[in-house]
Amino acid sequence: NTGGMKILVTAFDAFGGESINPTEQALELLPEEVGGAELVKAVIPTKFGESLRRVIALAEESSVDAIVCLGQAGGRKHITPERVAINVMDAEIPDNAGYQPVDVPVVEGGPAAYFSTLPVKEMVAAMEDCPARVSNTAGTFVCNQLLYGLLHHFAGTEVRAGFVHVPYIQEQNKADKPMMALAEIVEGITRALWAVQAS
């Protein structure tokens, strides 16, 4: 697969007192390739700064064409490709390094926002059998920081980047919150990746 497309897919480790992160489990179950694209998989820490540095380094050393970062958005009912990232870190809880920024820019002097460079509408359409919709806010925690930082770093290059949030999974036992079967998340993300490699 030397001439094929390469997609870096990342998941986060557990955070906020959880023992698991559904994205880490979904990542393990994703295929090694989708369509003609080879997947490069990595689990990254739920930490401001380090997560971004790690993903940029992985993307550059593997010479990937696209980056799809996965994250947990507890309380959402849908798999949600993110349309936009904003230039602020405003954490309701500390990250896994104990850092809790309040109203700090991701990039000092950077633009207010960046749009994802992945085809978010096509990704949602490809997930037709799974509950999926475009999200217009990625929050202000580590996920948004990662997406903003990637879009800033790779602006003007051929490397496309985006983020997909997923719901809690049943194993997390959130009786009062929407949950999704892990298998359904894996299926949805696989289809979304198919749309990325086809675009």
Please state what every model-predicted region is.
Residues 17, 143, 169-175:
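Short active-site-adjacent structural elements
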Residues 2-140, 152-156, 177-199:
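N-terminal catalytic or cofactor-binding beta/alpha core of small enzyme domains
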Residues 51-53, 145, 173:
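Short, solvent-exposed polar/charged micro-motifs at secondary-structure junctions
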Residues 74, 167-170:
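Glycine-rich beta-alpha junction loops
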Residues 138-158, 162-168:
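Active-site oxyanion/phosphate-handling segment shared across diverse enzymes
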